[in-house]
């Protein structure tokens, strides 16, 4: 015989099971969340340097001495969680001509305007937040090489490449390989290699005494 008590007992059992299932789900969610947070805590920023599309070659002066300088865009992507910052401590361009390696280091950040590159501030360390891209136009200039780093036959001003010698090189070359480097806090680096396309239009612009600058397209290597 059926009475009201059996129905109530069945409903109570169902309610208890549902409550237990909800508790288990909540526990699993909290465990997964805790695990995610724990993994995130130990995760290091994952940064990538995207290769530039072009590099501008231009003349610059130290007193009366004319030398080669460059401007390009460095785009640094941080593929990490938002709270994971990467600290950029330096940027440089490296190139080798006639067997001599030269280095240009970041000088200023800026933007392109009607009159060309307009500096907006000195280059200094900056952070890149997770999930973002830091995109900046950067001018690169030579620096004196430390005496402790000099190779046989080198001088402290080895990184200043004479403009006329560059034009001589360019007259017989069709490309120039450039090694792009981002220096990170902790000693790690990001790199990207490109090959500048020195076609006739670029050469003509660089040789024009009224201009002396040109944007060379980059081929990713």
Language model features with spans:
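Membrane-aqueous junction of the first/signal-anchor transmembrane helix
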Residues: 1-221
